[in-house]
């Protein structure tokens, strides 16, 4: 479903070049909940942007649904990205608009018929259990409710891939657990493949079946969650395990 092969990405910064990705490869299969974990600056967000077609690698390939993103025309890329939902850390919602309007926005931009918009928004509102907040302004919601709105918005185009960028890092532990349960429900009941990035080992342990550990732009370890965290090889992986055992957040 998602194949990233030997990708490299370098950015030019104020203090010289930053090697954001160095020979990075990951394989995400249909039905996976695949976690990318690493500390700040590890390259996680850059990798996610490659998968979403927002960045192009300097070398290597990014395949989604057996299509090389680098070879697609703009119209083809837009069509493919319609099947990729995105959930953000800071929600990226319009506070001055209602829950309904925020969720409907992707369909409004596509100029979908009003009855189609109404039906789809109500459907995803039921799924994320926010039916009673339909006409509420986003500014009046809690952090957890805002993230549910963000998830519902991502589901309006019926994606088969969901990319989550630190989707729970701004939430308290109890709310984090409820959002992770929702993501697991989306994976199980809708058959959506999920690729998430995080710096919290507990998030990966709770819902992921596979994980890749990143450090300094490289994947230093990958495999099943049980194998990687049960028998950590890389120093950074061992550090995550140690922090988790102490009950803290990496």
Language-model segments: residues:
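ABC ATPase "signature
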Residues: 222-223
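Conserved ABC ATPase signature
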Residues: 137-141, 145
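A short, proline-enriched helix->beta-strand linker immediately N-terminal to the Walker B motif
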Residues: 156-160
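A short, surface-exposed alpha-helical micro-motif characterized by mixed small hydrophobic
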Residues: 204-206
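Helix-to-loop junction immediately C-terminal to a conserved catalytic motif
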Residues: 52
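Conserved ABC ATPase "signature" region
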Residues: 68, 108, 115-132
